[in-house]
Amino acid sequence: MAKEDTGVTAPKKPETAQVANINGIDKLEPPKTKEETESSKSVSSEKAAHASDESFKRSIHEASYVGWKQIGGWEDKDELTLDDELMDMTRETFLDNIIPDSLYGDWYHSVAIFFIGGVASFALGHYKFSMGSAFFVIVITSLLYRTSAKKYRGSIRELVQKEFTVQKVENDYESLEWLNAFLDKYWPILEPSVSQLIVQQANEQMATNEAIPKFITQLWIDELTLGVKPPRVDLVKTFQNTASDVVVMDWGISFTPHDLCDMSAKQVRNYVNELAVVKAKIFGITIPVSVSDIAFKAHARVKFKLMTPFPHVETVNIQLLKVPDFDFVATLFGRSIFNWEILAIPGLMTLIQKMAKKYMGPILLPPFSLQLNIPQLLSGSNLSIGILEITVKNAKGLKRTSSILNESIDPYLSFEFNDISIAKTRTVRDTLNPVWDETLYVLLNSFTDPLTISVYDKRAKLKDKVLGRIQYNLNTLHDKTTQRNLKAQFLRNSKPVGELTFDLRFFPTLEEKKLPDGSVEELPDLNTGIAKVVVEEGSRFAEEEQKVTAYVEVYLNAKLVLTTGKATDTGTLKWNSDYEAVIADRRKTRYKFVVKDGKGEEIGSTIQTLNDLIDRSQVNKNLIPLKNQKGDIKITTYWRPVRLEIGSNSVAYTPPIGAIRVFIEKANDLRNLEKFGTIDPYCKVLVNGLSKGRTDFKSQTLNPVWNQVIYVAVTSPNQRITLQCMDVETVNKDRSLGEFNVNVQDLFKKDENDKYEETIDEKAKVGRLVMPKKKPKGTITYYTSFYPALPVLTLEEIQDLDKVNKKKKALELRKSAIDEKKISKEDKAKFDQEWNEVKELEDMYSNRQKLDLPELLQYNQGVLAVTVLNGELPDSGLYVQAFFDDNGHPRFVSPRIPSRIVKNGWSGDVIIKELDKSITTFRVAKNKNYNRVEKCVCEVELPTQELVKNCYYKPSILHLSGEGSAKLMLQISWFPIDTKQLPANDLITNSGDLTIMSRSAENLIASDLNGYSDPYLKYYINNEEDCAYKTKVVKKTLNPKWNDEGTIQINNRLNDVLRIKVMDWDSTSADDTIGTAEIPLNKVKVEGTTELDVPVEGLENAGQDGGMLHLAFSFKPRYTISVSKREKKVGDIASKGLGTGLKAGTTVIGGGVGAIGKIKKGVFGGLGSLTNHKKNHEMGEEETKF
């Protein structure tokens, strides 16, 4: 669109012109086409894209004048000198020397002058003088008034100066003149940039805002300045004797324009007041409206609630002690000679002040205040601060109203915030002493709004009658979150009409916390919380260029909870409606979105589980296709966990769709955070920000090689998988080296039966590590694969399905008995809701199999879900860790348990590769980061298969023993993975104990002068410098026979290489290496003995024949642990390796899973006892009895 000619010529810009460059884009250049313009970060790309399509005819208009310099026409020559600033504003006039001082200069003198001028004009007219004679009266009156008014303004300035000079009566207010002086100096410098930013943002929004009527073809700010005079802080008062974590302050703030009277033209160009000119183009006519000389004065009270963690301020309460005094000049048609002052309308200013008091009163005026939750605002979620649990017990002594219609009282309670009902109890029939015993959960946005509890009488054909109300102050819940057996009086006409007994509990929203290194602390994976669903927009509902009118109905678990407004357009329809709800069971919560046209006919619909909606928002896949490809709808979902104490629902596990295998090979060029030395890096895998597994750390390196596999369970294809590199810290928290999100969308493929397929991606991928506010540095090389889970029903879902089938039969019977003509609309809507809920649940469970436990146990690979319901620990402040198979680090860890009794449970999962050989270990530790070999308080170890058998159908108690004893109540679920076998690298046959039988050698190289050697062998694993095992020495021979045997630990048989050094023993000097050999350990068979003849290569030249070694190997598979115990030292970490192997004849210490032979009582309560096990667990040979 061409730039509009407003008929006003902009003045020449000064050399210091304001630059409108935001994020590399000049916002004041003429608007470009959609293809040329890149979206601003302040507006979504969708909004920017639609700004130029057919439905958005407005363009972003350029402002004519911005900033005080452009508004005032200031140029460099107008800079005030010292003489200009000292110019006398009370310059005398001719009449000052003639008229006595007592006859002019006060307000009543001005009244007298106008009175005399009026009388003189009347006299001239009465005596038939000509019109010209009135000119002399006007001149004389004007001169007298100018002289008197000028003196009067001078006297006012002197009075103000006197007020500043005289010492005030003592008070406890303080001034902030240092801040005012700072603003006076820098405000004229900052104001042009601030005004420019306001204009850019406002004009951009007004060009894309659909709420503006279509007949307004353009709307923009044409001129804007905040003036050269900044706001002032007039007074500050800090209250004493408040709590240590509470700060209360009074602030007086004012904003007053300059008095431009008696100033010279040069001074006026330097003292510019506030001005805003907004122009609207309506039917081709440009209409300007200007607002200038804005003045206000406010007195506010601010309360800060402090806390220890960042941002250190928990809440801020703002209260205006009175309605602010404000004034302004508003004119229609701008500053032209035809302008019309809007406030000249009689009574308009009074009306504005009254309306301000009416609408500000319930929010900002005493006793109310506006509460801001700072952590919530910083998180950007804009959700409620928590959930309020209301347990209504009973009411006593309700009194009837005087109405003659009250034959019986059927009371129920309604809970309200700001006259909006948020929850209701059931109705109790015909009683004045109702008992409800009902628990309700409501969203709480602020502690400052009182909770209104109204008791109503339910009436069939009349409106329900209010019997009484309670206004309950919730401020006490901030410090005391649980309040039992509260009693409050219902009031009617300020008289008690009954008493209510109830309980209140507040559960706060759990927010993410940023750590000093920029990383975000993990939130617990809870099943309860707050969900906010925003229906933003929709598209493709009709053919191109066809105008569509549509709205959306949102159903939560088959109940209609939101109906958006109607939107009409030819392209994208925008609704931007949201619904926030308390979620008691996230995994079972589902939303149905139905798009209907203007006539109420359905266009399309989609059913999404809450988990899927959350995952879509995590990976920015918010556009959801409707059924039968009838369009798309954009849904954004916000989720915050809340730890509700409602039993196992809060920690219930969501069934997975499969497992992703992440093979983490290595990292290169990592960031070194150490001032001295080098980092000790490891890698974590996170799912939606929650840690699900990690590698071992590699000591002192920037280029670690891990070659470790981590499996993570996923519940939808839209979950966010993240690889994060960390540096080990023994004293403080581990530090982040960067992270990146893994693209796994290509792994999820379905067959013709709509079931997920196994996908193995053998191509190596490289991801660059990114840190907040730092340049990317370092890469990780990894591989990914996907193994689908068998879709099976959980025990709870089987029970739910049985209930659904029973309910369906009951509804079918009711349907056959219903008379369509006699049924009311309410009853029909209720029946339709129940029927739709049954159909949705049937559809949700229709694609899953029902398998009993014996059938499930036929699958050897699967996802093991562990839910800890409650328990008892030996002490407070401990953590419960779970280890599986060869995990050196805990697969999942409980939150810190503040007391000995475990009240709040948790859940976790792990992929079991071989159920019949798997081992599970639970440990209670003082530090959540302790690994498998570090000290614990108590532990228990048992076969995973037995754990499934004993805890699948019902929870069982697990006993842990050691320095102390503990009990945990567990519930187990088993979800088979639909694959024949996982990669050999991940199985138990890839790790274990390698027994080396060094038998003999032939034709070794002579090293001594006598033509012989004193040979022995040294064995090394891969490139390790420490010897894993060495043989005895056989002296003076080239054909030794050792017949020696030793056992070493192998963590990766298929990829490890055994290096051999043939050594010559010397009594007087260091031993010499006379040859080397290598054996890939994948040549060693898992079963039986492997005989190998290994050629030796000499050191003098490549390929030199150094003889032949005759060796034999036997391998015993078992799960090994490659972690080491960390010791704290000054400035560094010293590690004691436990997985490097030992000399011949010794036993592997700490290498295998720990024994449970020390446990003398039953692992499961009331289920018997465990037999003793060997220290080195031999898979497949032990039996566990219950």
Swiss-Prot record:
Domain C2, first and last residues per copy: 366-487, 512-636, 640-757, 976-1094
Protein name from the UniProt record: Tricalbin-1
Name of the gene: TCB1
Binding-site positions, Ca(2+) 3: 1066, 1069, 1072
Alphabetic keyword roster: Calcium, Calcium/phospholipid-binding, Cell membrane, Coiled coil, Endoplasmic reticulum, Lipid transport, Lipid-binding, Membrane, Metal-binding, Phosphoprotein, Repeat, Transmembrane, Transmembrane helix, Transport
Database matches in InterPro entries: C2_dom, C2_domain_sf, C2A_Tricalbin, C2B_Tricalbin, C2C_Tricalbin, C2D_Tricalbin, SMP_LBD, TCB1-3_C2
Membrane topology annotation: Multi-pass membrane protein
Native source species: Saccharomyces cerevisiae (strain ATCC 204508 / S288c) (Baker's yeast)
Cofactor(s) recorded in Swiss-Prot or TrEMBL: Ca(2+)
Quaternary state and interactors: Interacts with TCB2 via its C-terminal domain.
